[in-house]
Each structure stands twice: as C-alpha cells, then as structure tokens.
Swiss-Prot record:
Gene Ontology process terms (BP): heme O biosynthetic process
Top-tier EC class: transferase
Organism: Polynucleobacter necessarius subsp. necessarius (strain STIR1)
NCBIfam families in alphabetical order: cyoE_ctaB, PRK04375.1-2
Record field: catalytic activity: heme b + (2E,6E)-farnesyl diphosphate + H2O = Fe(II)-heme o + diphosphate
Keywords: Cell inner membrane, Cell membrane, Heme biosynthesis, Membrane, Transferase, Transmembrane, Transmembrane helix
Membrane-topology annotation of the record: Multi-pass membrane protein
Record protein name field: Protoheme IX farnesyltransferase
Length: 297
C-alpha cells in the first residue's frame, strides 16, 4: 500500500510500526542494487556467507538509516499528506524508541558485515548511513533545493557496497554503477516532488519545484535523464558488459526519455506519477540486464 493510501487514524500492529520506519520498499531497491554489485564483482558465484551476510547487514543498516530519517523529519512528515501516517509522525513510536531501534539495527548490521564480509564493507556502509541520515536528511535537505543532487551519493552507494563485500576493494567498475544511480536519483525524485509539490509547500522544505517552479524542474529532469543515458553506456565502454546490456540500456533509456519529454511538453500530475513509477522499473530492469549479460551471455 502506498503512502498516500495510508491514514494516520489507522493504528498498525506494533511490529509493523517499526517495519514501516525502515521504508521497506526503498530498502528492497537498495539491497537489490547491492546484490547486483556483488554478482558483477566476480565471474563465479558469490560465496554464500558473503551473499547472505551482505544482504542482511546492508538491509539492517539501511533500515536504521531510514528510521533515523523518520525521526529527524518527524515534524515535517506530520505536515505532509504523503507521510503523516508514519508512526514517527503520529507519535505511535516515540523518539527514544526510534533511537533504540536504530541503534539495534545498525549495531547488528555492522557486526554481520564485519564478520561475514569484511571491515571495508562495514565502514563504507556505516559512512553511507551517516551520509544519508545525517548529512542529507539533517543538513542538506532543509537547506538547499539541490539537496538530492549533493546528497545523492549516499543513496547511490549500494552497488559499491556489494562490490566491496565480495572483493574487499572498490574498483572503477563499482564507481560506474554508483554514477548510474547518482544521476538517476534527481529525475526520479523530482518527478515525485512535482506531483507532491503541495505537500512540500506545506512541509517548508526547499524542494526544486517549490523554489524554482515547474518548468525549471522539468528542464532539469530532461537534462539529468540525458546524462543518465550517457552514464549507462559506461559498463559497455569499459568492458563490464556486452551487447545485451547495451541494447537494453538504450531501449530503457529511450523509454525513460520519452516519459520525461512528454512530461516536459504537457505536464500533468498523473504523468509525473507514471514517470516516477517507471523510473523505479527502469533502474531495476537496467541492473537486471547487467546481471543477465554478466552470467548468461
């Protein structure tokens, strides 16, 4: 069920209150990208302890980061229709309990990553936690409309975390994957911010559609999508993938571009929502194409 369909008047079971604080759908996408990074880092099978340890450890630390995000944005979330149902915003889960919950998740995640993967992965994941929960959420998001660009690195790190879990290094190939997510994030998020701009006006957060208007935001979405399409060529150019990935990346990129150009020409909230949803499908299929090309072709 989407955020917009939730209601602050509905009392969730206690376990689910904590579960939603981890933003499970976003966490799933992050872990998926981390797993792709693991498999792309080796020509063979990822060792099972590393695979499962990496999945669980990264999931736990990501969940902890999102819980801290909910805590910091408690007052902001309460003002927004999309997020007012969250247990942190309604007060069903107290700040102290969120802090304890985040410490438990984060500590377990660090222990698992240290023991099943390697210290590098643990420290990188912890740095990503700090980058998202503190630098982005606390410092950048309320300060600048370029928050999602400047703070986007933390959200783009999962493939590098997966790569490091397997190789105990960070090669150029890992950073190619990070770059793809980094330049994907602005058009993905700004599509959401456009059709939720009234929410962001209420929140007081300086999101680009609020501070610079619809047309400027749409232009930036188009520009970043073009940069994204160029960035997705890097895995092929540098020999990480073959023709199957290249063709998939071109087709998916043109589809994404068609959405954003249509949005630029004739904006509607409904089309912005479709563009936002397709952006998630786009990233999932793009990374799946990398995996298929790597192992099966």
């Amino acid at each position: 069920m989407s955020d917009s369909k939730k209601s602050a008047t509905v009392v969730m079971p206690r376990w689910r209150q904590y579960w939603v604080l981890t933003k499970p759908r976003v966490t799933q996408l992050a872990v998926f990208c981390a797993v792709i990074g693991m498999f792309l880092a080796t020509p063979g099978m990822v060792p099972y302890p590393v695979l499962f340890g990496g999945i669980v450890g990264i999931w736990l630390l990501a969940g902890a980061a999102f819980a801290v995000n909910c805590l910091i944005e408690q007052a902001v979330d309460a003002k927004m229709k999309r997020t007012s149902w969250r247990p942190s915003a309604t007060g069903e889960v107290t700040p102290l309990h969120i802090i304890i919950f985040s410490i438990i998740l984060g500590s377990l995640g660090m222990i698992i990553l240290w023991n099943f993967c390697n210290p590098l992965t643990m420290w990188l994941t912890l740095a990503t936690f700090v980058g998202y929960a503190v630098i982005y959420t606390w410092l950048l998001k309320p300060a600048t409309p370029q928050n999602i660009v400047i703070g986007g690195l933390s959200g783009a790190m999962p493939p590098a975390l997966g790569w490091a879990a397997v190789t105990n290094t960070l090669s150029a190939e890992a950073w190619h994957l990070v770059l793809i997510i980094f330049v994907w994030t602005p058009p993905h998020f700004w599509a959401l911010a456009l059709y939720r701009r009234d929410d962001y006006v209420q929140s007081g957060l300086p999101m680009l559609p609020v501070t610079h208007g619809e047309r400027f935001t749409l232009l930036n979405i188009v520009l970043y999508t073009l940069i994204l399409i160029a960035a997705t060529m890097l895995p092929y150019i540098y020999g990480m993938s073959g023709m199957v990935y290249l063709i998939s990346a071109i087709i998916l990129g043109l589809l994404f571009l068609a959405y954003v150009v249509a949005l630029f020409i004739s904006y509607s909230d409904a089309l912005a929502k479709k563009t936002f949803r397709f952006s998630i499908t786009y990233l999932s299929l793009l990374f799946a194409a990398l995996l298929v090309d790597h192992y099966f072709l």
